[in-house]
């Protein structure tokens, strides 16, 4: 359980640059000399699993079994280093993960929340991310759409090899289609065809397959829809008897897809198409034909596991991997697998060193777009995370979580050497270096070591000659803020 281990592992931001909802690049510090956790931050999870999976048959007797359990428990919880509150947080986080669905457990273990509150925040952000429409990779998204459509046979009525019809022919086709629909009262056989139409609209919109020759007064989205819908074989749309034929659910819908209430406005018709999920059929009544405009991005694809709905089938497929735990995208360098291709692309930049996202203000480059957005908040001053108690705003969600401990009085990180308690694990780790004498920050110029990164930064100014603190009165500069403050007193005395 990587999430449990993070109470032991400190994620210290190298720079307090503002933040997005996403995890930042962090510098991991781990309190450990005994078990080599500095080399392998996943060791805590290994110890936890060994403790939980230990069985009586692994020992020669009850005394050895108890002794071995005690040893494994200490390796996992490390009571010689952690306070009661920290151990309690570990146990609570473990139990919280245990009650989650397996797919969410795996996702959280990969993202390693520091505590239960952060785990909840991550899950809420994941839910928001899945609900938000995101632009699809045109090539990959188009392949997924067509593969899915071909597998269900929904495109058998389409001529995929023929070019897009001229716009004038499409308008005629749509008019004929509208008349055919209105002539058939009751159930209609065109459900499957309309399903194909919706898929094609999304494919064409995604791939930006727009032909020239826009008509006057025609909107951009209408033209894309008409070009997509014009490719349907009109003769096949008109098959079926007046009483209507039930159309069974497509094979891919048996588990993954559910067509919610689907209302779509076509330039030549205004209608409401009702989906009967219980029967797996579609019906249309002449009394239901209304004069209303419909949201073209209505969510049509519903997950049968959790009920969440999506406007594109590709997003449902991506969401389903949370439930199935499928990770089809593996890194060739280290073998790590991901459920999203975008996650793999971002991960591979660690190996390649590529940083394609550059800040237009200062030129600093980043591996991911989220890191750039977070960095941009330094320039814009944006602070989207606000405390409900005092109204103070923050640029990072993690900073807000830490701030809230001021109101709750939570100081769950206690030093076992002196009993002093802290609200953040990072402060505890820095404090414990007083007792351990650890100095992990070493100057490359002279080899001198320090217990805090800020102390190393100040020291390096001796070598670089940098004096960033300037007196506004006389323009004299100083290496340290304390030197500037002491100097400014000479002006105030005068």
Swiss-Prot record:
A zinc finger (C2H2-type) spans 301-323, 329-351, 357-379, 385-407, 413-435, 441-463, 469-491. Gene3D superfamilies: Classic Zinc Finger (3.30.160.60), DNA breaking-rejoining enzymes (1.10.4020.10). CDD domains: SCAN (cd07936). PROSITE patterns: SCAN_BOX, ZINC_FINGER_C2H2_1, ZINC_FINGER_C2H2_2. Keywords: DNA-binding, Isopeptide bond, Metal-binding, Nucleus, Repeat, Transcription, Transcription regulation, Ubl conjugation, Zinc, Zinc-finger. It is found in: Nucleus. InterPro entries: SCAN_dom, SCAN_sf, Znf_C2H2_sf, Znf_C2H2_type. Disulfide bonds: none annotated. Residues 48-130 form the SCAN box domain. One of its GO terms (biological process) is regulation of transcription by RNA polymerase II. There is a cross-link at residue 197 (Glycyl lysine isopeptide (Lys-Gly) (interchain with G-Cter in SUMO2)). One of its GO terms (molecular function) is RNA polymerase II cis-regulatory region sequence-specific DNA binding. SMART domains: SCAN, ZnF_C2H2. Belongs to the krueppel C2H2-type zinc-finger protein family. May be involved in transcriptional regulation. This is Zinc finger and SCAN domain-containing protein 30. It comes from Homo sapiens. The lineage of its organism: Eukaryota, Metazoa, Chordata, Craniata, Vertebrata. The gene is ZSCAN30.
């Amino acid at each position: 359980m990587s999430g449990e281990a993070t109470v032991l592992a400190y994620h210290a931001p190298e720079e307090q640059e503002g933040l997005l909802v996403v995890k930042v690049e962090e510098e991991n510090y781990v309190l450990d000399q005994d078990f080599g956790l500095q080399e392998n931050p996943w060791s805590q999870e290994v110890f936890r699993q060994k403790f939980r999976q230990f069985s009586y048959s692994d020992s020669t007797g009850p005394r050895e079994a108890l002794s071995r359990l005690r040893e494994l428990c200490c390796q996992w919880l490390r009571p010689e280093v952690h306070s009661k509150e920290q151990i309690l947080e570990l146990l609570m986080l473990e139990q919280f993960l245990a009650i989650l669905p397996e797919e969410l457990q795996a996702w959280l273990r990969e993202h390693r929340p520091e505590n239960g509150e952060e785990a909840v925040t991550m899950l809420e952000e994941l839910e928001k991310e899945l609900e938000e429409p995101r632009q699809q990779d045109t090539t990959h998204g188009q392949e997924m759409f067509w593969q899915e459509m071909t597998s269900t046979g929904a495109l058998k009525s389409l001529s995929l090899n023929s070019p897009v019809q001229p716009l004038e022919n499409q308008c005629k086709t749509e008019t004929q289609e509208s008349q055919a629909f209105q002539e058939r009262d009751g159930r209609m056989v065109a459900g499957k065809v309309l399903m194909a139409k919706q898929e094609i609209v999304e494919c064409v919109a995604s791939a930006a397959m727009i032909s020239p020759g826009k008509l006057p007064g025609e909107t951009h989205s209408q033209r894309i829809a008409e070009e997509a819908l014009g490719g349907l074989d009109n003769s096949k749309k008109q098959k079926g008897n007046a009483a209507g034929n039930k159309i069974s659910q497509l094979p891919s819908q048996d588990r993954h897809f559910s067509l919610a209430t689907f209302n779509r406005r076509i330039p030549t018709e205004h209608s409401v198409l009702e989906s009967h999920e219980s029967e797996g059929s579609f019906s249309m009544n002449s009394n239901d034909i209304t004069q209303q405009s419909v949201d073209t991005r209505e969510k049509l694809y519903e997950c049968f596991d959790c009920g969440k709905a999506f406007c594109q089938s590709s997003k449902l497929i991506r969401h389903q991997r949370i439930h199935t735990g499928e990770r089809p995208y593996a890194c060739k360098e280290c073998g790590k697998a991901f459920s999203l291709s975008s996650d793999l692309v971002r991960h591979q930049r660690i190996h390649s060193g590529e940083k394609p996202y550059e800040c237009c203000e200062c030129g600093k480059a980043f591996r991911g777009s989220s890191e750039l957005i977070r960095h941009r908040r330094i320039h814009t001053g944006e602070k989207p995370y606000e405390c409900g108690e005092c109204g103070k705003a923050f640029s990072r969600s993690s900073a807000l979580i830490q701030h809230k401990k001021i109101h709750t009085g939570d100081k769950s990180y206690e030093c076992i050497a002196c009993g002093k308690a802290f609200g953040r694990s990072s402060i505890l780790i820095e404090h414990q270096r007083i007792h351990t004498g650890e100095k992990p920050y070493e100057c490359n110029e002279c080899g001198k070591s320090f217990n805090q990164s800020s102390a190393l930064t100040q020291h390096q100014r001796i070598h670089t000659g940098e004096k960033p603190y300037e007196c506004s009165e006389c323009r004299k500069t100083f290496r340290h803020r304390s030197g500037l403050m002491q100097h400014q007193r000479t002006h105030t005395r005068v």
